[in-house]
From Swiss-Prot:
The keyword Ribosomal protein applies. This is Large ribosomal subunit protein eL31z. The keyword Ribonucleoprotein applies. The lineage of its organism: Eukaryota, Viridiplantae, Streptophyta, Embryophyta, Tracheophyta. Keywords: Ribonucleoprotein, Ribosomal protein. GO terms for cellular component: chloroplast; cytosolic large ribosomal subunit; cytosolic ribosome. Gene3D superfamilies: 3.10.440.10. SMART domains: Ribosomal_L31e (SM01380). It comes from Arabidopsis thaliana (Mouse-ear cress). One of its GO terms (molecular function) is structural constituent of ribosome. GO terms for biological process: translation. Belongs to the eukaryotic ribosomal protein eL31 family.
């Protein structure tokens, strides 16, 4: 690896637990779900280093499942950095954020996991 390059140039998938309760504290009731989506985008941008962040429909449905005022306190997401196939794309990579399956034991102590691609 070259000095100063970083590891932002490879295709990778990771699972994270995002504490939305901490990020949405002191947020107006009627803005909680939209701000939760924005915070997930911001988290993926920081974790993967790509400006193009795409949120999956199932994740959006889960955030909005209890209405605008009641997004989940914590959510387990799978963030994948993928190569952009469009020729006219500004960015070489994009991030796709999907909802991950939650184990029966709960979310505590899971940490970050690197997922091996099946492709």
């Amino acid at each position: 690896m070259e000095k100063g390059k970083g590891r932002k140039e490879e295709v990778v998938t990771r699972e994270y637990t995002i504490n939305l309760h901490r990020r949405l504290h002191s947020c107006t009731f009627k803005k909680k779900a939209p701000n939760a989506i924005k915070e997930i985008r911001k988290f993926a941008l920081k974790a993967m280093g790509t400006k193009d962040v795409r949120v999956d429909v199932k994740l959006n449905k889960q955030i909005w499942s209890k209405g605008i005022r009641g997004p989940p306190r914590r959510i387990r997401v799978r963030v994948a950095r993928k190569r952009n196939d469009d020729e006219d794309a500004k960015e070489e990579f994009f991030s796709l954020v999907t909802v991950a399956e939650i184990p029966a034991e709960g979310l505590s102590g899971l940490g970050t996991k690197v997922i091996e691609e099946e492709e």
